[in-house]
């Protein structure tokens, strides 16, 4: 049997065929043709987005050809002599290639997600179909029917197929032309921000077979993939024109999803989303998030690559590691003979699936390409559609009923997840104020999605100012009293983004419930490591404002973090974050005293001297913590380090790790220890304030 390529990974309207072998037998070739014909006929029950009549007629001819090939196979198998006719073989091989291409074309025109794009390419589709049908009929007419004892009926069937192909040529269909004209007219309206006729849009959607929210999601995903592919195709000089068209179509289908189909369906989009999440959960069941973290940066890898030892790292992290003069594997310490990096495609796909399932947005899943969601639309039509959508959704938030409001906040959450353009449109449309009001909703669905929308809008500059000006109080209330765990975590993340502005960081800190609320997440048993890290990230953001330092200490941060570290049940990423926060607190004398009084120095030394398999970031922040304790604790703290024989060896190990190992801090600690040993003086009063002396150990 001849195996052909599947459609996976194939660009639309490309036909990568496999030529039958020169030595293939006629019977084997006929078997493959019959199987291909059967595969093609399965498309009879599917919806064609374009050239519907032409495809139906073509499938009728394939049905007739299937009868012909089955009859030829029977005749040859029943023949007592070996059958070999070069003309027959050549004819069937050409038909086989034509069938492969036809199958690909059928896949494209019935593909979920590609309906709108294929309809806009209806002229090109009809050209391909015309060429293929003529090629198949020409090859069939060259078949030496005299060499096979066929019945009169079969010979007449062959003549019929050939005559039909010659007489009835494939032409662009009127309905397709009308639909394309309608779309172009609507795109022109979008440019001028004019609301199109919904009835006209519904006629287009009916024509191509898009009737559900989930259908629109598939279309958007496909168009995004095509935009990415066009950008990467450097050979195309006119690629920008195609990107502009695809961007316009994405704007159109987003408009349909939010405004047209949103009115028709009740919760179809929610069910579709939940079903998708369930499938994704099934696919990544048993996955440990730690497996997706770069061993160097302890962050989820955006561009995973494999080095010579077989270990996987994030490209940017391992590149900097090598750039610092290190030619060893960070995990094993093995000296490498090559620093070549190989893409880990499997891990990248798992990371994408994990991020999609958990709503995680990375800066870029691959540094070599931009996500289509994270760029400004590349057409005026798409920009106009985005502004109309934002205006509509904001109006729904203000004037809609409960279900309309729910659909609007859910759509805003999706629209703003990664698109800075959509965030800008919604902020300008005035969506922040009604979203903040909806945080008080008794409907937990509305509250959760409104909070997720606020989180996304907090990444926008103007969004920050509006949220900080109107909603800090309600954000802190949600942080402490949100109906769902996810809602409280969204609030913590929003506070982190707001804390990047100094004035907002001060205002957050002045709220007496903000920092304690974040620390409750860090110490809470109901929260996983990922949630605790999100809360710590917000705390670190607040610590950038010096006025918040004492507030974090007052919230019990030091004992909470030390207890977490002592538990030994947290991930390397959370360990590194705890140490980083303690190091920041220890920059001030009060923080140093708090850490030392609770045995933090001893614990830090223990972590530093632990197994060499500890993540590099853990050791880096551990060194930073010890250094700050020494700077504020004086010679008493340094003296403790001198007494521990393992400290120097651990520091030299960190020093050898280069930039990521905190080499400058390790070098400073080594220098302090050497100076202490060289002086060999008596007891020296520590730098801690009188009356506040604490034992370093």
Curated annotation (Swiss-Prot):
Pathway(s) it belongs to: Protein modification; protein ubiquitination
Subcellular location: Endomembrane system
Catalytic activity entry: S-ubiquitinyl-[E2 ubiquitin-conjugating enzyme]-L-cysteine + [acceptor protein]-L-lysine = [E2 ubiquitin-conjugating enzyme]-L-cysteine + N(6)-ubiquitinyl-[acceptor protein]-L-lysine
Gene label: PUB18
Note on domains (UniProt): The U-box N-terminal domain (UND) confers binding specificity and subsequent ubiquitination.
EC id: 2.3.2.27
Keyword Membrane (UniProt): yes
SUPFAM superfamilies (alphabetical): ARM repeat (SSF48371), RING/U-box (SSF57850)
Annotated protein name in UniProt: U-box domain-containing protein 18
Keywords: Abscisic acid signaling pathway, Membrane, Repeat, Transferase, Ubl conjugation pathway
Enzyme class, broadest EC rank: transferase
ARM repeats: 420-459, 461-500, 502-544, 546-587, 589-631, 657-696
CDD domains: RING-Ubox_PUB
A cellular component annotation (GO) from this entry: membrane
U-box domain span: 287-361
Subunit note: Interacts with EXO70B1 via its U-box N-terminal domain (UND).
Pfam families registered for this protein in UniProt: Arm, PUB10_N, U-box
Recorded superkingdom: Eukaryota
The keyword Membrane belongs to this UniProt entry's keyword annotation: yes
GO biological process: abscisic acid-activated signaling pathway; protein ubiquitination; regulation of abscisic acid-activated signaling pathway; regulation of seed germination; regulation of stomatal movement
Region annotation U-box N-terminal domain (UND) required for EXO70B1 binding and crucial for the negative regulation of ABA-dependent stomatal movement: where it falls in the sequence: 23-210
Molecular function in Gene Ontology: ubiquitin protein ligase activity; ubiquitin-protein transferase activity
